[in-house]
Amino acid sequence: MDRLADYLLVQTEHPLTDTQQQTVQTLGQQLKAKGGYHKRLNRQVQKTSKSKASARLIMGIEAPEFFEATEHHLRYRLSFNEGYSTGLFLDMRDNRHRLLSNLIEPGFPVFEKGTGAAKVLNTFAYTCSLSVCAARAGAITTSLDLSQKYLEWGRENFRLNKLNPDDHDFIYGDTFDWMKRLAKRGEKYDLVILDPPTFSRSKVSGLFQAKRDYGRLAGNASALVRKNGMLLACCNSSGLAPSDFKADVRRGIRDAGRKIVQSFQAMQPLDFPVGENEPAYLKVSWMRLN
C-alpha cells in the first residue's frame, strides 16, 4: 500500500478479498485518507489498455484528475487516471534524495565541487522527477523521452517547484538516436541517468528490451560522461538478474573504453520488501567513470 498525498493506493496481482478490503477501509480511517484506490498488477502491461491499467476507487471520494504530492520538500503532479503508473515511482525515492542532496553515501558526492553548474542528461525521463531533483541541486538538465505528454508533465513538475523549465532542455525523441547525435556534437555530462522501461518501442531504433539491450545502452551512455563524471544505471526488470545487470553494465562501460573508479549499489527500499516469492527486482548502480 502506498500513500500519495491524501489518497491510498493498494496494488495486488489478484482481486482484493473482503478482509483486505476491510483493512483498506480501516487504514484509510486511521490515516484520514480522502480516498483509496486499487490497482491490479499485470505482467503483460504492454498489452493492457490505459483504462484497465488505471487504479479504481474502492473507498472514499475520487481524487481530482491531477493532484500533488510532496516528497523531500519537492512537489510532484500525480494522477490515478494515466494507466499503470501515477507519475512517480516510489521505489526510486531514496535515489531521488541522493541526487537532491548531492550525496550518494559518505565521501561519495554525485557532483564534484569546483566544476560550476553540473550538466545532467536524464534519458527515458518520464515525468522528469530525477531532473527536478538535479535542477534543485543546482544542475542544468536535459530530459529526453519518447512522449511529448510526459515531457510536458515534467515541465509542470519544474513549475511546481519554482524551477523555470525554459532554463533546461526537454528533448522529444529516441534515446539511442539522441545519444548518437549528442556524441557527434561532443557533448559531455557530469551525470547521465539511465532508467528505461523493461520494454520500449521506437520507430527509429525498434524494440528495446532491458534484458537484451542494457549493455549497449550503458556503452552509449558512457561515451557522454565527462572524465570523473557519473553514470546512474537503473533497471526494474525482474527478468534481468542483479548479477547479469551488473555484468551487462560493466561490459558496456568497458566496450566504450571507460573504467569505473568508484561505485555504489543501491538496495531496494525497505518498504518494497524482498522475499522468497518476491525477489528483488530493482537494480541501481551509481558509478564514477575515469
Where are the regions that the model predicts?
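Non-catalytic substrate-recognition/targeting regions of SAM-dependent transferases
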Residues: 1-2, 18-90, 97
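Conserved SAM-binding motif I beta-strand of class I
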Residues: 140-145
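Mobile active-site "lid"/loop adjacent to the S-adenosyl-L-methionine
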Residues: 150, 172, 189-220
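C-terminal catalytic and target-recognition region of SAM-dependent MTase-like enzymes
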Residues: 230-290
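S-adenosyl-L-methionine
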Residues: 147-193
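Helix-to-beta-strand junctions that scaffold the AdoMet/dcAdoMet cofactor pocket
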Residues: 225-227
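Conserved SAM-binding loop of SAM-dependent methyltransferases across substrates and taxa
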Residues: 127-139
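Conserved class I S-adenosyl-L-methionine
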Residues: 110-126
